[in-house]
Amino acid sequence: MNSQRLCPVYRKWLQLHPANARAHRLSLQIQAQEAHQQGKSAFARDKCYQAFETAKVVLTALQPVSKSNITTAYNDIISFGALGMYLSSLLQRAYKKHEAHEVLQECQQLLIAVMPLHAANPSVCRLISAVQHCVDSKGLPPNTLPMPNVACH
């Protein structure tokens, strides 16, 4: 899935300013939830897509990986997984099952891709595995994606 819901220039700016991107992600998530509660499904999906893309930008932004910012890494991973599952749910309700599946698959692929970045932090690796399991149980058929080849203990 190659969604382009964010302006490429803005996406680049978010990559360079992850703290601002986190605030933007939260704002978009709130807008999506409010729109969903008000019955504005299309608007909710659009805002959720933007929040999901922003979460993806934050997760892949070059940031120092250390024991001092583990809480930030936890929040980024949980937000990404939760937004992916929420977006998938919104898409399924709109009878866009293929798109919903693609979102979950993208979640899985990105979580696998970022695992090696956190190999020095076993608790972060365990969290990534737990989020992968949640995404898996949300709707991906078994064996859709290969298991990560990085060992985290």
Task: Tell where the protein language model's regions lie, with residue ranges.
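Extended HEAT/HEAT-like alpha-solenoid repeat tracts in very large eukaryotic scaffold/adaptor proteins
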Residues: D76-L87, V131-D136
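Short, charge-rich amphipathic alpha-helical segments embedded
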Residues: Y49-N75, Q109-N121
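Amphipathic, well-ordered alpha-helical segments in soluble domains
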Residues: S27-L28, T54, S79, G84, ...
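Conserved positions within tetratricopeptide repeat
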Residues: R45, F52, H98-Q105
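Structural signature of alpha-solenoid helical repeat junctions
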Residues: A23, F43, T72-S79, E99, ...
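A structural signal for the main folded, soluble domain(s) of proteins
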Residues: L28, I77, S88, Y95-K96
